[in-house]
Amino acid sequence: MAEFIHGNQSIHYELAGVREFRLRTPVLLLHGNGEDMHIFDNMIAPLLGAKGFVLMDSRMQGESFSLDGGGEISYSAMADDAAALMDELGINEYDIVGYSDGGIIALLMAMKSFKVRRFFTIGANTDPSGLTAKAVREIKTALRRANHKGDERTAALLSMMLNEPHITSHQLAGIIAEATIILGKKDTVIDRKHSERIADAIPHGTHVLIEGAGHDVPDRKSVV
């Protein structure tokens, strides 16, 4: 595993798959809230001989950490970290697969950069209103638990889910990359109509429902 320093953040990442991945439009993989890059291990295992992958732990998650104990925890900051890493690696065109929070980061990156050729979001939302009532209750319960334990990092990550993002349909309309917005048919975290509206707002957007899957699509299907 390698380390990339971006501001006051140590971002840990890994390159996997074909060696000449820069020549084959590599895939950047972005995990969900409080997770790490290894959620994608099973999904990419059959594809390592044909594709190149960049896996990373988003800031203050997994093996990534703040060098001075500070730093902003936001989707925008995480998107900036990921874009800076790809620039550091000299990758000028790439695809993204983002799961849950990683899907939000993928949307933000596609809004800002022409280097994103196409992207897949799995169980992502563009506004806290896209979370189901059940998900909000569970996040608030987890947040109270984290605050009680004095776990500031986890509390900040959970608060982010309740207060961000705020991506408008106008911003989505400016995305030029091809987008596949994926939702498990049994997902109890993201509202289906909200997910469908994301795809409808992106000019080259498609919505896909995965039969039999909940919010944990990376464990069920290969979408790359």
Show the residue positions of the predicted features.
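Conserved HGGG/HGGXW glycine-rich cap/lid loop of the alpha/beta-hydrolase fold
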Residues: Q9-F65
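Conserved alpha/beta-hydrolase "nucleophile elbow" surrounding the catalytic nucleophile
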Residues: N33, Y94, G98-S100, G184
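Active-site loop/oxyanion-hole signature of alpha/beta-hydrolase fold enzymes
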Residues: A45, L55-Y94
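Flexible "cap/lid" loop of the alpha/beta hydrolase fold
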Residues: I104-K115, F119-A146
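Active-site nucleophile elbow and catalytic-triad environment of alpha/beta-hydrolase enzymes
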Residues: A156-Q171
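Short beta-strand/loop motif that positions the catalytic acidic residue
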Residues: I175, I181-L183, D187
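Conserved alpha/beta-hydrolase "acid-adjacent" motif
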Residues: T188-H194
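Conserved small/polar residues in nucleotide/adenosyl-binding loops
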Residues: V223-V224
